[in-house]
Amino acid sequence: MLVALALGAAAYLKRQAGPPERSRQPVWQKRFCVRVIDGDTIELDGGERVRLIGVDTPETVDPRRPVQSFGKEASAFTRRMVEGKNVRLEQDQDTRDRYGRTLAYVYLQDGTFLNAEIIRQGYGHAYTRFPFRYEQQFVQLEREARENSRGLWAR
């Protein structure tokens, strides 16, 4: 009797829960980078602007601020890495920022993870204002860049 009651309750709860959630598999897009706006923003074919998730580099194009120290170097690094090249995009839970830019992780054809590489080389830091999939990895990469005096962390 108890077994039947338990099975009935489980079936009822399953129906109430609705359909199972889709797995959070990344959605990949293959695209072409036509230009680099700054160290953490690129423009793709079709004019779409992409803000790299979890990365903040010194500003170079914000009209409200002067060019920040190491901003030109960060922009040049991103330009060398992706401008004029095919890339793959992976999105996270938030797909657009407040400026309408696409939010994405960017990968090169050889598999290099651009967002992580910018932080690893010291061209930017982990931007943790909002939660994201690779947050702990990026925080660790920034710590290592600081400890090894890479890029903007050079003494």
Enumerate the language-model features and the residues they cover.
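Small beta-barrel nucleic-acid-binding modules, primarily SNase/OB-fold domains
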Residues: 1-155
